[in-house]
Amino acid sequence: MIQSERQAIFDTARDTVLAALPEAWAVYVYGSFARGEDWPDSDLDIAVLLPPEQRIPDLLKLIGDISKHIRRDADVVDLRSVGDVLRREVLESGRTLFESDPEKVLAWEASAMSRYAHYREEVRGILDDFRRTGIGYGK
């Protein structure tokens, strides 16, 4: 796919998200499209950062609307609701399509990456204990 076609898909997806969620803080694309490794049957992976305490009211409708407009499958995640590992993937390898307030978004991203670093240290401790004792937690 040429870059202009990819950009048109990004623009359409972003505009569809913002029409449904005008209060969104940020919209990202991640996965194969963000890496430029998409195929004709690749889906478009979108992550949305909403204000605190707000969630996507009708996720399936939003996914359907995006898919209809870009003429391919799409997947949408609420960045506040996903796990630390997926959140890190979006923030490290994704591409930002929209930011309402770059300073606010950057502060949230920094906090999210800090949470991931703490999570990673916890997992490292669990794995070290398991390697040392051969016993997992809960046994």
Segments and roles (model prediction):
Residues D45-V48:
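Short beta-strand->loop micro-motif that forms the acidic, two-metal-ion catalytic signature
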